[in-house]
Swiss-Prot record:
This is Cytochrome b-c1 complex subunit 10, mitochondrial. One of its GO terms (biological process) is mitochondrial electron transport, ubiquinol to cytochrome c. Residues 47-78 are mitochondrial intermembrane. Residues 1-26 are mitochondrial matrix. Keywords: Electron transport, Membrane, Mitochondrion, Mitochondrion inner membrane, Respiratory chain, Transmembrane, Transmembrane helix, Transport. The keyword Transmembrane applies. One of its GO terms (molecular function) is ubiquinol-cytochrome-c reductase activity. It comes from Candida albicans (strain SC5314 / ATCC MYA-2876) (Yeast). It is found in: Mitochondrion inner membrane. The chain crosses the membrane at residues 27-46. Component of the ubiquinol-cytochrome c oxidoreductase, a multisubunit transmembrane complex that is part of the mitochondrial electron transport chain which drives oxidative phosphorylation. The complex plays an important role in the uptake of multiple carbon sources present in different host niches. SUPFAM superfamilies: Subunit XI (6.4 kDa protein) of cytochrome bc1 complex (Ubiquinol-cytochrome c reductase).
Amino acid sequence: MVSYVKGPAYKALSHFGKLNAPLVRSYIPNLVFWGAAAGGAVATFTEGVPLFQKTFYEKIPFFGQHWIYNPDPEDVPV
């Protein structure tokens, strides 16, 4: 026999404005993807800027040596 319910069972979700936990959780993969893409774009477009080279890129372990400027003595003007 089928058990009948007297009325609909409502559940209140905790929210902040129109944001609730399941909604925010569904956006996390997109935010991670676009955040990584934005970080990659910033890294690409600031690679040639000396301020970024000295501040960030030279301090990267193992790969930081690529951005350290060390010219040959023959190439330096006197």
